[in-house]
Amino acid sequence: KKYYLKKELEVIFTKEPGGTELGKDIRGILLNPESSISSEAELLLLMADRIEHVTTKINPNLKKNKIIFCDRYIDSTIAYQGKGRNLSEDKIKELIDILNLPIPDLTILLDLPVEDGLLRANKRNELDRFEKEDINFHKSIRKSYLELQKKDPKRIFLFDSSISENKLFENVLNLIEKKIHESH
């Protein structure tokens, strides 16, 4: 983020859930370890956040030709709610189509073995509702992300996150720079 804010590119940094005021409220509900939410309600809360986010932040900035960096988006929903919550991936994709959600030009998939990822999450902060799920939940999500990447390798790029932070940053930055150069 700091790197791109120093450059003379028009960039937006955002996240889901939580990239709008409504999204912040939804994020609080979704991540609260005390929340008990059905899989279907979880999906619809995420989609409510997403449509608000796309309508008020993503689409207006795309129209201004800004570069948008979004921490989580449609692939996360397919992985978490599709494989993680055992909801129909086809129905999720149909919902994405119905809502006319833009497909990212590039998705960066930072991959780590599940156990290593959970160790990092534990060190970072108190675990949220998703992070507290059992190991099989996380393994199914990782598997889903890897399957998505194999199906769409021109859009979803896989990076081994077990390498040094500096090397990972360099590798990801090189790819992003290449993509920006190709599109401008």
What annotation goes with each model-predicted range?
Residues 7-9, 103, 154-155:
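Residue-level signal for beta-strand positions within conserved beta-sheet cores that form or flank
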